[in-house]
């Protein structure tokens, strides 16, 4: 009996040791990420000018600073990009800011091949921080995602960013002052442990009658775009009701499905 107890406690010690090592490594990596970003003049300058203001805005909204967890969603026809924030995964998201998207390429509907000038539609996450972008600062998204790879042409394209300036051939530009804020928020969330910052891109606000009317009018002869948008709307509706993100999967045909 004593030997069995010894083995149990020995195993617990090993588990605890591994947990502590992994935690230390993750914390170190997060700290290193922030330190690395601060080495870039644009990031350091933006932090000096904007961090205090963002901190006060967070306090006024009842949010903890630095940002713990953020969610980004963008609406193509409505030319808006929202930033939602919450303090932890048990809370509902709160809308923090809405930025104007100052330029748009292409039409409604998903991106399907290199050079179509389309802004993607679907469910993504930030996979790159680019502090020395040609467009001031840029946040890359993981286009093409697994759905895009199934549904798209052999060359679906890539290099899709949320960035500064006000030009685009398929990205999401929100001008320099706004990308500085968003970059700081995303950087803070990543440094706080949010490895996957979701970015959802919708063709329209599905609760805006004018947007819905425009979508119906311009896609009336394209059932594939309509069917694709209907899948996106399910996720939109879920978030509008719950203020939390559903678990999203992709089936063998490339279609999005909600798992909860």
Task: Identify the role of each PLM range.
Residues 30-169, 177-197, 206-260:
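Cell wall/extracellular polymer interaction/catalysis modules
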Residues 202-203:
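Hydrophobic transmembrane alpha-helices
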Residues 1-34:
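Bacterial Sec-dependent N-terminal signal peptides
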Residues 174:
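A conserved hydrophobic position in a structured secondary element of the catalytic/binding core
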């Amino acid at each position: 009996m004593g030997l069995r107890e010894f083995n149990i406690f020995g195993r617990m010690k090993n588990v605890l040791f591994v947990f502590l090592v992994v935690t230390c490594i993750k914390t170190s990596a997060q700290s290193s990420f922030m330190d690395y970003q601060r080495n870039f003049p644009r990031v350091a300058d933006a932090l000096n000018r904007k961090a205090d203001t963002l901190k006060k805005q967070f306090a006024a909204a009842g949010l903890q600073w630095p940002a713990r967890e953020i969610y980004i969603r963008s609406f193509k026809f409505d030319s808006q990009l929202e930033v939602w924030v919450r303090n932890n995964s048990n809370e509902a998201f709160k809308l923090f800011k809405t930025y104007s998207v100052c330029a748009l390429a292409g039409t409604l509907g998903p991106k399907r091949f290199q050079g179509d000038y389309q802004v993607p539609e679907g469910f993504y996450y930030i996979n790159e921080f680019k502090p020395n972008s040609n467009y001031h600062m840029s946040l890359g998204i993981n286009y093409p995602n697994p759905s895009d790879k199934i549904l798209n042409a052999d060359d679906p394209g890539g290099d899709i960013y949320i960035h500064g300036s006000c030009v685009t051939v398929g990205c999401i530009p929100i001008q320099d002052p706004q990308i500085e804020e968003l970059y700081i928020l995303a950087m803070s969330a990543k440094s706080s442990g949010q490895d996957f910052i979701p970015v959802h891109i919708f063709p329209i606000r599905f609760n805006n009658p004018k947007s819905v009317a425009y979508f119906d009018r311009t896609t009336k002869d394209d059932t594939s775009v309509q069917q694709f948008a209907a899948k996106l709307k399910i996720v939109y509706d879920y978030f509008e009701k719950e203020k939390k993100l559903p678990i999203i999967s992709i089936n063998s045909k490339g279609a999005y499905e909600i798992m909860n």
